């Protein structure tokens, strides 16, 4: 039997998602059924990044030791990464791009940049050792892996020689230096980023691997955006 709190939450959700309400629902037909979707949600994460960072502008977003980045600065760095991935690293729409590193400002910016470039951010477990990293990379067919030095070293130690190119980054360095292997010194002003839809791949997360080798499970931009807006509604 639902509790009083459950009933109150259900009523509030119904009010928020009713026709004409701020989070009114629409239907998206997929898998043979109509799925409820928040109508005002943007079509892709690239749109949401742009909107959210513009809304918060100079507000402090990332704090890492003495390093501080506002929403505006973070978005500018992600945009630069995205354009560099397209122009300098030949990232194509739908390419699986691995991210293998510890928590750091660079991780956030690379994740945003990969999605904005049209790539599918493939999130490799930072606890994995070399053989596990190599297996994950090959399982999803990643064309490029952005790794901090310890994870790059783990791949080197097992003699990784797969199809993916590894770019090692010093994520402990200041941001400009940390991401220099990505964006270099090239003029990126002429790069046009792809216009993404909800059907484009956004991320790959790996299963726990508790009963076998971890396997990559993908989510589209629509799924990630709607998951975010479901959280907002709740």
Which role does the model predict for each range below?
Residues 57, 186-206, 213:
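Conserved pre-ATP/AMP-binding loop-to-beta segment of ANL
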Residues 150-198:
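ANL superfamily adenylate-forming
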